[in-house]
Amino acid sequence: MDAHTIIVAATAIAVGIIFGAAGLGSAIGWGLITSKTIEGITRQPEMRPQLLVNTFIFAGLMESFPFIILAFGFWFLFANPFLG
């Protein structure tokens, strides 16, 4: 095999691992955000509106992470900078 084929194959494997890690990280993040929000609401019910606002803000920030990773992954797949 030539170097071009090896680079393309390694990039495809790496991007697959990166996509899986981004999805797993997003799922873990959602779980942590919601569990801590429920704990906070249970502990102090009068803080519910503030906790929900903060939850949605941080959930939106956390949800943008997989989309950024998706863009970088597709960039490496279709416009691979390592192929020169």
From Swiss-Prot:
Entry-linked CDD domains: ATP-synt_Fo_c_ATPE
Transmembrane segments: 13-33, 56-76
An MF annotation (GO) of this entry: proton-transporting ATP synthase activity, rotational mechanism
One Gene Ontology CC term in the entry: proton-transporting two-sector ATPase complex, proton-transporting domain
Chief location bin: membrane
Localization per Swiss-Prot or TrEMBL: Cell inner membrane
Sites annotated Reversibly protonated during proton transport: 63
Pfam families recorded: ATP-synt_C (PF00137)
Topology of the protein relative to the lipid bilayer: Multi-pass membrane protein
Domain of life: Bacteria
Keywords carried by this UniProt record: ATP synthesis, Cell inner membrane, Cell membrane, CF(0), Hydrogen ion transport, Ion transport, Lipid-binding, Membrane, Transmembrane, Transmembrane helix, Transport
Family: Belongs to the ATPase C chain family.
Subunit structure and binding partners: F-type ATPases have 2 components, F(1) - the catalytic core - and F(0) - the membrane proton channel. F(1) has five subunits: alpha(3), beta(3), gamma(1), delta(1), epsilon(1). F(0) has three main subunits: a(1), b(2) and c(10-14). The alpha and beta chains form an alternating ring which encloses part of the gamma chain. F(1) is attached to F(0) by a central stalk formed by the gamma and epsilon chains, while a peripheral stalk is formed by the delta and b chains.
Function: F(1)F(0) ATP synthase produces ATP from ADP in the presence of a proton or sodium gradient. F-type ATPases consist of two structural domains, F(1) containing the extramembraneous catalytic core and F(0) containing the membrane proton channel, linked together by a central stalk and a peripheral stalk. During catalysis, ATP synthesis in the catalytic domain of F(1) is coupled via a rotary mechanism of the central stalk subunits to proton translocation. Key component of the F(0) channel; it plays a direct role in translocation across the membrane. A homomeric c-ring of between 10-14 subunits forms the central stalk rotor element with the F(1) delta and epsilon subunits.
Protein name (Swiss-Prot/TrEMBL): ATP synthase subunit c
Biological source species: Acidithiobacillus ferrooxidans (strain ATCC 23270 / DSM 14882 / CIP 104768 / NCIMB 8455)
Lineage: Bacteria, Pseudomonadati, Pseudomonadota, Acidithiobacillia, Acidithiobacillales
